[in-house]
Amino acid sequence: MRGEVKMKIGAITVGQSPRTDVTADIMGIFNGKAEILERGGLDGLTREQIQEFTPKEGDYVLVSRLNDGTSVTFAERHIIPRLQQAIQELEEQGTAFIMMFCTGKFPDTLKAKVPLIYPCEILDRVVPLLTAASSILVVTPSPLQITQSEEKWSRIVAQVSVTACSPYGEWKELEEAASLVKDTKADLVVLDCIGFSQEMKQLFAKETGKPVILPRTLLARLVSELTDV
């Protein structure tokens, strides 16, 4: 009996690969029918080298995870060429399509020969469908991202409240953040970073009593439609 051939799916993190924290929550969704091949925008770089990417005023800010489990904050513009290289490498490995392990917005200059699936594009379309009052609470990793998050979501929904709490910090900080926002008026909570886990989703759902959108599983469930054959 022939072994089942798994579909090759690329995954690009803006930080360092592999993102074992993300795949821990999503591999079960693919039900053994997919092989995930990963690359990262900061792969091969030391923390000292990454510090040269520190955001300046006007930069689009990203937060991601390094191999040692710590997080870094950096300007997107520094890694665009590295992301393009990652796309090319994954295409050469025969991936059917590529998932971006980041909810940030990326420039149209990134090109791929296979479908390149951005969580932000999914969120932009799905979130308005799930809030009757067009009112959401967004959790973003860094205070440096609050303004860009407010600007982005205010174009999509009528009312948005944004708070900052890193998925890469201490669990106590997440508990405090969830407690602080539990009375915020909103229909829906959006954990706007691929770093937020299923356990973190459950924490915010319990504290706020509201439905919570988790990008990593939303992305995987959409992509699994293409592997479920």
What does each model-identified segment do?
Residues 174, 187-208, 215, 219-223:
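Hydrophobic alpha-helical
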Residues 2-73, 140-170:
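N-terminal glycine-rich anion-binding loop in soluble enzyme alpha/beta folds
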Residues 44, 132-133, 168-170, 212-229:
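Short, flexible loop segments at boundaries between secondary-structure elements
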Residues 99-106, 111-147, 151-155, 159-176, ...:
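Conserved mixed alpha/beta catalytic, RNA-binding, or beta-rich assembly cores of soluble enzyme
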Residues 85, 170-185:
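A short, acidic, amphipathic alpha-helical segment used as a generic capping/interface helix at domain edges
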Residues 73-120, 187-197:
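N-terminal glycine-rich phosphate/adenylate-binding segment common to multiple enzyme folds
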